[in-house]
Amino acid sequence: MKLLTLCSAIGLTVALDCRPEGPVLPKPANLGDAASFRHAAVGLAHTFDAMSAGKVDVPWPVENVSFSVAVVSADQEDGTPLWQYHHRANANVNGTEKVDADSQYLVGSISKMITSYILLVAGMELDVPVTKYLPRLNSSKEMEWDSITLRMLASQTAGVPTNYGFSDYYFLKDVYLALGFPPIDDSEYPPCGVIGLNEGCTAQQLETGLRDSYPVIAPGSRPAYSNAAFALIALAVEAHTGMNYTQQVEELLSKPFGLTATRPSPGNDSKAVIPPGQSSWGADYGINAPQGGLVSSIADLSKLAHAILSRTAALSPAQTRQWLKPSSYAGSMSSSVGMPWEIRRYANLTVDNPHPVTVYSKGGGAQQYRSQFSLVDEYGLGIVVLTAGDMHALTYIYDAVLSVLVSAADKVTRKHAKAEYARQFSNRGSQTPNSTVMVEFTLDDDSLILSAMSRGSSDILEGWIKVFSESLGMFGPKISGTVRLFPTELNEKVTLDGEVVTKEVWRLWPDLVAPTAVDLPGSGLANGDCLGWTLGDWIHYGGEPLDRVIFYRKGSHVASFEVPFLRSGMMKVSS
């Protein structure tokens, strides 16, 4: 039996309470106009005002910490933050006298995300050995350079050393001796990049030094953080394009996006947020700029976040979605690593309606500077936090923004879904006898639910569940009586009744029943797996998938609905 063969290929073994990755509901539109979101942002601003005035107990000297925060929405026209907050530390004596969206900060390893973007738009082969572009690496005795690709370098899975030269802390030489380490000659240190001993590395010195260094891990085995990998990426892009890193940033990033502040350090002192005391501001990072030596601003990073969220960057929408994916696990149940995203799945961001929310981030740091660039793609939300001063402040400020405003965005999203999607649709008035189709959706604490679907006097929802249960349920977990639906991001502009509307394809998703516990070792162990995604698109009726439905939206308002497998035609709101 063909169906038996196909379902066996799925490998269904367990029943699960799970949902597809990605948006649970349509991303919020006009988020900045929502009163509840504005109220949350105002409350957060008051909290930061109190914190900066020393009225909130925090583990850092508030008089030394400047910071800027921006929140960006995908549906904005130009990437201008829908909310921003800036504070200049009272102890600052140098740099700008007013911190705003155009003020410059060192952004540390956010540079890696920018270097990865440059790599993606440079038109290079990502899955060939890096030695295609940097042949000097070929003659290594220690590293398997012919097994290391550009994608592995950008995804932190190449096993390349963290640094070359920089990790030898020459200024601690006497400390090592006092601790009982054996004395060594200066000649035993790397010939470049050792602060306090020698000059920064040239491209040739870096490649030669890394060629002969020890690998950190076997290539491709797991993530191992590397700064040097991104210097190699920039050198490979230079070999391919003829542009040095400064030119790459200007031509492939700043000009296309209209950025004015993003460049390799040193930046512009008059626009800089410079903390009191010693810091990395003004440093020339040289060949290390691609890994952590860029300066930027809230205005620039907001534009970049908007372009990624709105799929308007130089990458195609499919390439952008693929970029925002993990490439390896990071050692915990909730963390993974991308290219070079630091990806975290939060279970508690939306307290009123808990569900896993994935945040794609890149953090950065330099002496007295820390930064965070995060995308909450499910809500089309970008968060940028830049700090100058005590480096502990960033985590607390970022967590406050993330927890307050993602929860606020979720509430706006659910309110909109309840008003526009959780409704009844029908094609009453059909000329064909007994062919009136009625569909009704409700919204529970998790998602939209298909609560009723009929054609004439037939209960199609009951029949739908029966078809899925009898054809697929026997090979895996039982199908429950709850059928959910989720957006697919397959949206397009079409003309309906002479008007341009947005066609949204959704997929139905049956909840699965957990198997009965039995008195055997390991019973229930597989319940944490999520195999619901394997059921999609399995059953068709005359070429139309039984799980595919379509909403048609005019602006932010749902105008009509269609069930192609019922040949319903356009259905209007009936309640």
Predicted regions and their residues:
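Active-site-proximal loop and beta-strand segments within enzyme catalytic domains
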Residues: 22-31, 61-63, 73, 83-226, ...
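Well-ordered alpha-helical segments within folded domains of soluble proteins
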Residues: 113-116, 229-234, 302
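Long, well-ordered core segments of solenoidal/helical folds
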Residues: 253-263, 323-331
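Catalytic loop of the DD-peptidase/beta-lactamase superfamily, centered on the K-T-G motif
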Residues: 16-89, 102, 283-575
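"… SH3/SAM/PH, and C2H2 zinc fingers" -> "… SH3/SAM/PH, FHA domains, and C2H2 zinc fingers"
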Residues: 100, 105, 133-136, 215-217, ...
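Bacterial peptidoglycan biogenesis and beta-lactam-recognition machinery
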Residues: 121-125, 238-246, 255-262, 307-315
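Non-transmembrane alpha-helical segments in soluble domains
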Residues: 45, 49, 120, 131, ...
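Fungal secretory targeting signals
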Residues: 1-15
